[in-house]
From Swiss-Prot:
Name the record gives this protein: N-acetylneuraminate synthase
Reactions this protein catalyses: N-acetyl-D-mannosamine + phosphoenolpyruvate + H2O = N-acetylneuraminate + phosphate
This protein's record includes keyword Kinase: no
Keyword ATP-binding found: no
Length: 346
């Protein structure tokens, strides 16, 4: 799986990573605020906007009214009731996003949510970490035959395997996202090597869905080969909400887009470890050649007493060959401080 296309966006290992700003529930249920955040992301250079599609009664049982997330003071049920957009408002948000030329992406947290997004005509699905091992829901969404970006936080390789099998069986193009689901995530729990483990285990494109408070983890992920980066997004860090603390604002988003492009260039595309041809101008003066360090008479044996290695590297014998010519006899008189050539000895 070398490439995924979502409308006009191409994701592969050669291009700069796709940066996904997630508005999520940062709009607190306000369509107008959601539009303001879309505008802010657009102004920063975003190509895509991610939302969360919550249909609470299909997503959660009443037991969720007793579960309070670690980054909140009210139950997850109450949070989602407050923040969910209904069909009309979400469709309006999707249309607004697309009028700006941006791709609308969302995470469904239920079968009804997935059906809503399919009915709206989305081009791809984002799967949250909590749904990574929700195999019935994964199968349901896979039936739509759309590309999927799948977060894998809180899951092990073993629990991810059934999801990947579903995707492969349905021939779904996908990216696996390493994630740590702590809001915010301390740097010592980012564990970027886990992203490499996903790539090794599943031979797929990978990315990072990050919940730290800066862009550092994302940039590190790019250096390691991330094709997709995701962070929560807000137009202002002064907003209220459980995800604001780990969100990026317009300035941070603009920086992440620009710096991730630069990091991808610095990473390169699987080049082997060898000198770049452009380095020749430096090689010429930085490398060393074999030179005489005193006058040498014809017939004299070359030794460490009369030859050594010195810059520049423009001589006939490189420093790497020094030991191979020790013990050879000079075929001519050689003046001190002369760069040797193979014609000088036998």
């Amino acid at each position: 799986m070398k490439e995924i296309k979502i409308q006009n966006i191409i994701i592969n290992e050669e291009k700069a990573p796709l940066v996904v700003p997630e508005i999520g529930i940062n709009h607190n249920g306000s369509l107008e605020l959601a539009k303001i955040m879309v505008d802010a992301a657009f102004s920063a250079g975003a190509k895509i906007i991610k939302h969360q599609t919550h249909i609470v009664e299909d997503e959660m049982s009443k037991a969720a009214k007793k579960v309070i997330p670690g980054n909140a003071k009210i139950s997850i049920y109450e949070i989602m009731q407050k923040c969910a957009l209904d069909y009309k408002d979400e469709l309006a948000l999707k249309e607004y996003t697309e009028k700006l030329g941006l791709v609308y992406l969302s995470t469904p947290f239920s079968r009804a949510g997935a059906n809503r997004l399919e009915d709206m005509g989305v081009s791809a699905f984002k799967i949250g970490s909590g749904e990574c091992n929700n195999y019935p829901l994964i199968k349901h969404i896979a039936a739509f035959k759309k590309p999927m970006i799948v977060s894998t936080g809180m899951n092990s390789i073993e629990s991810i395997k059934p999801t990947v099998k579903i995707l492969l069986d349905n021939e779904i193009p996908f990216v696996l996202m390493h994630t740590t689901n702590l809001y915010p995530t301390p740097h010592n729990l980012v564990r970027l090597n886990a992203m490499l483990e996903l790539k090794k285990e599943f031979s797929c494109m990978v990315g990072l869905s990050d919940h730290t408070t800066d862009n550092l983890a994302c940039l590190g992920a790019v250096a390691l080969g991330a094709c997709v980066l995701e962070r929560h997004f807000t137009d202002s860090m002064d907003r209220s909400g459980p995800d604001i603390v780990c969100s990026m604002d317009t300035k941070a988003l603009k920086e992440l887009i620009m710096q991730s492009e630069q990091m991808a260039i610095m990473r390169g595309n699987n080049e082997s470890k060898k000198a770049a041809k452009q380095e020749q101008v430096t090689i010429d003066f930085a490398f060393a050649s074999v030179v005489s360090i005193k006058d040498i008479k014809k017939g004299e044996v070359l030794s460490m007493d009369n030859i050594w290695v010195k810059r520049p590297g423009l001589g006939g014998i490189s420093a790497a060959e020094f030991e191979n010519i020790l013990g050879k006899k000079a075929l001519r008189d050689i003046e001190n401080d002369t760069q040797l050539s193979y014609e000088d000895f036998a």
